[in-house]
């Protein structure tokens, strides 16, 4: 068994699909069922014995400053969050990666998935019955991931936390350093880089039940999980819109981000009864 050294929580992205709530507050800092998403994750890590936690910030980074005093975490700012994909967040913490959890700040774990010790590198997965647009994993007889494809049916797909052992961390950061200034890397997720080198970056699939790990890409999805958001969106933008239209917040739904050609969010659209 391998002792977990630390955890990295990725919280740099703008989460444009979560508009308009993400315009006012970083998605990682919204309250779900009475707990702030990232605070719940930090507590779960601490309960598992993982004390050394790094939070990579970018968009609305100032909103995370209170976490230092409240939880004693380390904040690391990713100044390239708006021009590069999430591989840049891995790059800014490359010197602390060893036997490390890599977490998404906006995941909600129904139960604590973290441990003080792990067997080896893994990526968490949820099973999809029928078709999914998610990143689907294929494994060998020993459980190692040998292929990943976007979209699939009756398959295990990537969702949740990841664990990198020291060997994985060392080789991944070497590959990242070697390719960091290449023009074609800018838009790549760290997962893209992993898949390109999947033969040498050994990682197993760790399977979870569908009701264990949750992710909310839109306000509509959040409402399905936390019904308190149906009547109270906690958004001053939506409260003003509802008042202007003479409706209650529950009648505003079907939220979609409107994006420019460079994929930058420029607004949002929604459906309103009547």
Describe each model-derived feature in a short phrase.
Residues 269-274:
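ATP-binding glycine-rich loop module of kinase domains
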Residues 110-185:
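Conserved core of the sugar-phosphate nucleotidyltransferase
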Residues 1-23, 72:
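N-terminal nucleotide-binding beta1-loop-alpha1 segment
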Residues 35-52, 92:
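A short, N-terminal amphipathic alpha-helix
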Residues 60-62:
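A conserved acidic beta->alpha catalytic loop
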Residues 2-7, 157-261:
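Conserved alpha/beta core of the MobA/IspD/sugar-nucleotide pyrophosphorylase nucleotidyltransferase superfamily
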Residues 65-135:
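Conserved beta-loop-beta/alpha segment of the NTase-like Rossmann-fold superfamily
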Residues 5, 51, 98:
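Short acidic/polar active-site loop segments enriched in Thr and Asp
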């Amino acid at each position: 068994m391998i002792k977990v050294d630390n955890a990295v929580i990725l919280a740099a992205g703008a989460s444009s699909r979560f508009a308009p709530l993400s315009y006012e507050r970083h998605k990682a800092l919204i309250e779900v069922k009475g707990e702030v998403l990232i605070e719940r994750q930090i507590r779960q890590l601490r309960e598992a014995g993982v004390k050394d936690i790094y939070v990579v910030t970018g968009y609305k980074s100032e909103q995370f400053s209170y976490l230092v005093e409240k939880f004693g975490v380390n904040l690391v700012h990713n100044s390239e969050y708006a021009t590069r994909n999430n591989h840049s967040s891995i790059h800014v913490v490359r010197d602390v990666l060893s036997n490390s959890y890599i977490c998404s700040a906006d995941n909600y774990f129904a139960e604590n998935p973290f441990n003080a010790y792990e067997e080896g590198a893994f990526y968490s997965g949820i099973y999809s019955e029928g078709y999914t647009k998610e990143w689907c994993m294929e494994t060998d007889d020993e459980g190692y991931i040998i292929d990943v494809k976007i979209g699939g049916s009756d398959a295990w797909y990537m969702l949740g936390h990841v664990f990198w052992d020291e060997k994985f961390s060392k080789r991944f950061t070497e590959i990242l350093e070697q390719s960091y200034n290449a023009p074609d890397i800018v838009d790549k997720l760290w997962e893209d880089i992993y898949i390109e080198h999947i033969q040498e970056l050994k990682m197993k699939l760790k399977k979870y039940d569908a009701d264990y790990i949750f992710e909310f890409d839109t306000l509509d999805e959040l409402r399905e999980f936390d019904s308190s958001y149906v009547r109270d969106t906690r958004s001053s933008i939506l409260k003003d819109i509802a008042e202007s239209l003479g409706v209650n917040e529950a009648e505003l739904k079907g939220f979609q981000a409107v994006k420019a050609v460079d994929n930058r969010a420029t607004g949002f659209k929604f459906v309103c009864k009547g």
